[in-house]
Amino acid sequence: MKQVRLPSSATVRAACAVAVAALAGCAQIPRDPIIQQPMTAQPPMPMSMQAPGSIYNPGYAGRPLFEDQRPRNIGDILTIMIAENINATKSSGANTNRQGNTDFNVPTAGFLGGLFAKANLSATGANKFAATGGASAANTFNGTITVTVTNVLPNGNLVVSGEKQMLINQGNEFVRFSGVVNPNTISGANSVYSTQVADAKIEYSSKGYINEAETMGWLQRFFLNIAPW
């Protein structure tokens, strides 16, 4: 009868550890976009109406000549002038100094005078702490992007969002924008600055070799997760 030799438990554990490490390392860290709402919206189709036979034909798609041309409906477009310039500086410091001195004169009994004639105790302590810290950041983002009105709030404000994709060589660049626009801040050129947009979310990301070069490798991420230091 032929005997089958099974692998030892240590070998099985080592194989399982290697398999788990490989699976854990292959897992990519997803980068969730900060803008979760839809990037565009289409206006509802108007109800078909019989043409009255006159020059004036009412309807959703109609843009009267003497009416305000600023966006106000779902599906209208608006140009956002991105002009973000943020500078932040922070500094802090702490300084503590504490000193103490204590003396004790202990009287001794007469029969112990020869042994403890000078029983004087003294204690001196000092504690000093000094620390400083500072941080600074500067971010600048300029550009333009045309967005779409995705919702109209009850007070008339417009919820807008949009995305621009640019394929440069072998890298795909993404610019995403969303926020709430007050129609009164829209200029005659159908544009508004990003500094006038409430709840603005601006995202600039890319996909390609440059982005992959900036991403930590799977094996390095694995050892970084299990390293105790």
UniProtKB/Swiss-Prot annotation:
Domain of life where this protein originates: Bacteria
Covalent lipid adducts (N-palmitoyl cysteine), residues: C26
Membrane topology note: Lipid-anchor
Lipidation sites (S-diacylglycerol cysteine): C26
GO cellular component term of the entry, any: cell outer membrane
Subcellular location: Cell outer membrane; Bacterial flagellum basal body
Name of the protein in its database record: Flagellar L-ring protein
Taxonomic source organism: Burkholderia cenocepacia (strain HI2424)
